[in-house]
Amino acid sequence: MKEMISRRSFLRVMGLSFGAAMLTACNTGTADSPADSPAASVPDADTPVPFLTEDEFPRLDGSTACIPLMAQMKADVTGMDLLEAQTSITVSTTAYAWENFGLWSRSDSEDYGAQLLIVYEAPEYVKEELAEADAKLEQKAIGRDALVFIVNEENPVQSLTQQQLRDIYAGRITSWKDVGGVDSPIVAFQRGVDSGSQTLFKKLLIDKGDGQLMAAPTELAPADMGGLVDSIAEYNNSANAIGFSVYYYIDQMYSKPGLRLLAVDGVTPGNDTIADESYPLCNEFYAVVHADAAPDSPQRKVYDWLDTDEGRRCIEKAGYVTLSVTPQA
């Protein structure tokens, strides 16, 4: 059964119990002595301290795989219930989020466009559009994810090298037997050119080789990540298919029975191997504001907050890999 919202990320509501004990006063009319009064509740040091109202919270956009983080941010920054925050988050996906933010929206707009992006890297054609428009954006890396490859659990192949993956997607390796599997054709799924995962696929794998990439027919290039996962699982009831996604999405947001992740160069993707970058196909994701966002604007406050201890705890709480903090010299 599909699991559109993982229990490990979306249902991590920090349900803090403030047991306020109401003491019934005696009929003597005397006040409680300090010794008789209940001890004051001491907030947990890790409990987020809200600093914006729900109405003040900046409008967000970004990548599909960042939706759980956006919801956790909104809950922590405003104090609203996490489940309620989840229902308020929608995104236009990676490429469109960058285009809309860089080309159309303004930092001083009261009612149009996003004010803050939480997003994966932009496709090259979008970077070119932003450069041509001289878009003034400020961005910083706030976490790390990875490009991962998905196969049917019945496929005996456990690991592929980066070069084997390049050869598969260039059409030079066409049978699983050539990489230690059975004598069956390899059916290699991709994503559309405007997707965040396709951008990482080209940057981290294809462009580090000879750049050769076979064109994928429409039926092998689903429009969304969920469609790709479904297609790999359901393709011809066989173990021939391979595809890719970002680790967080497949691990936390859209898991599906019958699939598993391949190791790459012998390293299995996971939070630990992504954190220390021993898994070879890692990349960062970003927070982005307009460069002219005022210091006291809600979007700038949230952007800066992501660098604080509370902000990093928020990222971790949502299940993402945070970046190591380098001490200042």
Which ranges hold each PLM region?
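Intrinsically disordered, low-complexity regions
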Residues: 1-2, 119
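C-terminal motif of bacterial Sec signal peptides marking the signal peptidase cleavage site
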Residues: 24-25
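N-terminal secretory signal peptides and thylakoid transit peptides that target proteins
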Residues: 2-18
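Exported/periplasmic ABC-transporter solute-binding proteins
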Residues: 38-329
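Bacterial Sec signal peptide processing site at the extreme N-terminus
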Residues: 29-34
